[in-house]
Amino acid sequence: MEFKNKVIAYCKERNANFLDFEKYVSLIEEHNKNINLTGFSGESLWEEGILNSLLYMNSSTKDKSEIKILDIGSGVGFPAIPYALLRENNSIDIFEPIQKRVDFLNLVKQKLTLDKVNIYKQRAEEFSQKNIYDVVVARAVGSVKTMLMAAFHLVALKGEMVLIKGPKYKQEILEAQEILSKLKVEVIVDKFILNAKENFLVRIKKLRNCPKEFPYSWKDIKKQS
């Protein structure tokens, strides 16, 4: 249980309640038996699910307080729920389009008393409000180009979209150049190691309001993918 022990140590360093993480993992394992919620189980649930989510979110938010965060396509709650258990003072919204996962996330919210987490059955590109969130994250949801087209309108001015990517991140940024050229942004790439694997945080800071065509419809996003 190497990675579970790492989460225990992580919680001790930050005065977080590890028992909440155990309850969360138990809920995932219990409900995953009957509903296909995630492919993670056992040790990979602690590594790829919990620990990686904590490292990703802390790097994305830089330990800021009193900020508004959006997690797109959260599934069973990665990366938002582990971070919410660690940092209870930040407001977190989750957009998840699949009903069975929405139901599970609402159960987790209730069982773990996550009052500052809100779950919506929602696709990002269908949400018309703009300039809302200080940090928008998405893990294994879509390419840089897709995420910009679908969700960059949700990022507040001076806020950031932060996407975790592997070694092919340069190709994704290159493929997104046409969309990036329509925006005024600052793109910064931070390299960091997750469990001996090289990962990259692509941070896209909004410096000006998005043009009117944002967000693109899912039909247009698929056409340009």
UniProtKB/Swiss-Prot annotation:
InterPro entries: rRNA_ssu_MeTfrase_G, SAM-dependent_MTases_sf. One of its GO terms (molecular function) is rRNA (guanine-N7-)-methyltransferase activity. S-adenosyl-L-methionine binds at residues 73, 78, 124-125, 139. The keyword Thylakoid does not apply. Its EC number is 2.1.1.-. Pfam families: GidB (PF02527). The keyword Cytoplasm applies. GO terms for cellular component: cytosol. Coiled coil: none annotated. It comes from the Bacteria. It is found in: Cytoplasm. Keywords: Cytoplasm, Methyltransferase, rRNA processing, S-adenosyl-L-methionine, Transferase. Belongs to the methyltransferase superfamily. RNA methyltransferase RsmG family. NCBIfam families: rsmG_gidB (TIGR00138). Specifically methylates the N7 position of a guanine in 16S rRNA. This is Ribosomal RNA small subunit methyltransferase G. It comes from Mycoplasmopsis synoviae (strain 53). The lineage of its organism: Bacteria, Bacillati, Mycoplasmatota, Mycoplasmoidales, Metamycoplasmataceae.
